Design a protein with these regions (language model features):
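C-terminal motif of bacterial Sec signal peptides marking the signal peptidase cleavage site
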Residues: 15-16
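Beta-propeller domains
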Residues: 52-66
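Sec-dependent signal peptide recognition
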Residues: 2-11
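A short loop-to-beta-strand structural motif that recurs across blades of beta-propeller domains
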Residues: 57-59, 101-103, 142-145
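A short beta-strand motif characteristic of beta-propeller blades
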Residues: 24-31, 67-74, 109-115, 152-159
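Short loop/turn segments immediately following the C-termini of beta-strands
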Residues: 53, 97-98, 137-138
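Short loop/turn segments that connect beta-strands within beta-propeller blades
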Residues: 62-66, 105-109, 146-151
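Beta-rich, blade/repeat-based domains predominating
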Residues: 31-45, 75-92, 101, 116-142, ...
């Protein structure tokens, strides 16, 4: 596993090299209690939302002050978040790769469970018209459309998309 991780880091480094002198690396947060970030996304508020499966939390980071300003965790109903996405209202949703839950926080800050298509749910995105899509990897490999409010069951677009 370590060899694979090193190979991935090397490949990322190799392909991210550029001849431009304008590129620079800037450290946002140091010494933070973030246990490995799996997915991250800038929210409409300009803050960086970082999801951690291992830490089982979502950290909200102000990249101007380099501070973690909020953290959602188990006490907020966040369990093993992997990836994260925002809709046009600024609500954010995440996938939990281990439990299969797709959930988010609505405009009022209440947790909403969109559904549970099963373990391995990983990538998540909203279309321009706020339709929610997720897919699975590792355990299964289906592609689903989810009702963000959780009122209707996940719609299977394609099962076994990897075959």
């Amino acid at each position: 596993m370590v060899k694979l991780s090193l190979k991935i880091v090397f490949i990322f480094f190799l392909f991210s090299c550029s001849k431009s002198d304008d590129n620079k690396i800037e450290l946002f947060v140091s010494g933070a209690q973030i246990a490995g970030v799996n997915g991250m996304h800038f929210g409409p508020d300009g803050l960086l939302y970082a999801a951690s499966v291992i830490g089982s939390d979502i950290s909200i980071i102000d990249t101007k002050t380099n501070k973690i300003i909020k953290r959602y965790d188990l006490s907020d109903g966040v369990v093993g978040p992997d990836d994260i996405a925002f809709n046009s209202k600024g609500e954010f949703y995440w996938t939990s790769i281990l439990t299969g839950e797709v959930a988010g926080f609505n405009e009022n800050g209440a947790k909403v469970i969109a559904g549970n298509p099963g373990p391995g749910v990983n990538p998540i995105t909203f279309s321009d018209d706020d339709r929610l899509f997720v897919a699975q990897c590792f355990f299964d490999n289906g592609l689903f459309e989810m009702d963000p409010s959780g009122q209707t069951a996940p719609r299977i677009i394609k099962e076994e998309i990897g075959e």
